[in-house]
Amino acid sequence: MAFSGSQAPYLSPAVPFSGTIQGGLQDGLQITVNGTVLSSSGTRFAVNFQTGFSGNDIAFHFNPRFEDGGYVVCNTRQNGSWGPEERKTHMPFQKGMPFDLCFLVQSSDFKVMVNGILFVQYFHRVPFHRVDTISVNGSVQLSYISFQNPRTVPVQPAFSTVPFSQPVCFPPRPRGRRQKPPGVWPANPAPITQTVIHTVQSAPGQMFSTPAIPPMMYPHPAYPMPFITTILGGLYPSKSILLSGTVLPSAQRFHINLCSGNHIAFHLNPRFDENAVVRNTQIDNSWGSEERSLPRKMPFVRGQSFSVWILCEAHCLKVAVDGQHLFEYYHRLRNLPTINRLEVGGDIQLTHVQT
């Protein structure tokens, strides 16, 4: 079964988690699990690619264990019986630290990348097309699980061009509470063609239906600032925009603007010098009234990474930071399709944009 696009991600799902892989595993599918290893007494976590929800048939069991110096077990379970373990004694995960774990399905094997470095290759013991479920359990907190089909991209993913155990050309992973969602890893730092994926999300672990116009992902290693791009089709209810990056250690301010012609329909402006997140609209070069109230403390921290989700609804924009709902901003410019430009500037390193 061919993919026409990519499955929407699961956002901040509770652990233990089991979710459907729409259409099952396909050659070329990339699945990314992004989260943080808990600092608790737990010593293991696992990511399973399995048939159904029983756990009796697991095509690929990826199981980091913080025991005996740390190691990772890979295995397959058929009809409730485990096969011989394959162990890798290097432990790429750290307790209390975020991680970015990507699985690439290929005809002969799974290739696994951890924090931008190709970590292990696991040859199929059972036909991978039987797999229709992903499950995660153990001592982790999840930020998201995302899906991407590189067949929609006219370039090869870096897994197929980078020698085994060699790092991909991505900037060093910044330490912080959340990490950037990955795109297709380029084999060199040059920009590559954008790819189409679906990413709209409602409640944690749940997904909206596919939007009328699929979102665009711009998988650059890093972005020049300020950054400006077109929002294909403009805004509409269920449209989702995702940005990730790292706040500079000496940051004063940065902004994310959604623009309509010469107007700024939505101005999101974290200000570290004021310990505030300011929201506003500018029409004909005149600013409206600021909105500053927040349900909790300032979510952005100097020197730490962040993710911002902006979800357009009929009457407002809903904004979440690091997977947690932060505020709603009611539309002041109501002709949503004309809001078709994204501008980002200020004291951040921008690492991922999806519109």
UniProtKB/Swiss-Prot annotation:
Residues the record lists as binding a beta-D-galactoside 1: 48, 61, 65, 75, 82-88
What conditions trigger expression of this protein?
By toll-like receptor ligands zymosan (TLR2 ligand), polyinosinic:polycytidylic acid (poly I:C) (TLR3 ligand) and lipopolysaccharides (LPS) (TLR4 ligand) and by pro-inflammatory cytokines IFNG, TNFA, IL1A and IL1B in mesenchymal stromal cells. By IFNG in macrophages. Up-regulated in dendritic cells following infection with dengue virus. Up-regulated in Kupffer cells following infection with hepatitis C virus. Up-regulated in plasma following infection with HIV-1.
The processes (GO biological process) annotated in the record are: cellular response to type II interferon; cellular response to virus; chemotaxis; ERK1 and ERK2 cascade; female pregnancy; inflammatory response; maternal process involved in female pregnancy; natural killer cell tolerance induction
Q: Where in the cell is the protein located?
A: Cytoplasm; Nucleus; Secreted
Q: Which residues form the Galectin domain?
A: 17-148, 227-355
Q: Does the keyword Ribosomal protein apply?
A: no
Checking Pfam families in the record gives: Gal-bind_lectin (PF00337)
Q: Which residues bind a beta-D-galactoside 2?
A: 267, 271, 281, 287-293
Per the record, what is one GO cellular component? cytoplasm
Subunit organization: Monomer.
Q: What is known of its domains?
A: Contains two homologous but distinct carbohydrate-binding domains.
Q: What is this protein called?
A: Galectin-9
Q: Which organism is it from?
A: Homo sapiens (Human)
What does the organism's lineage look like at the top? Eukaryota, Metazoa, Chordata, Craniata, Vertebrata
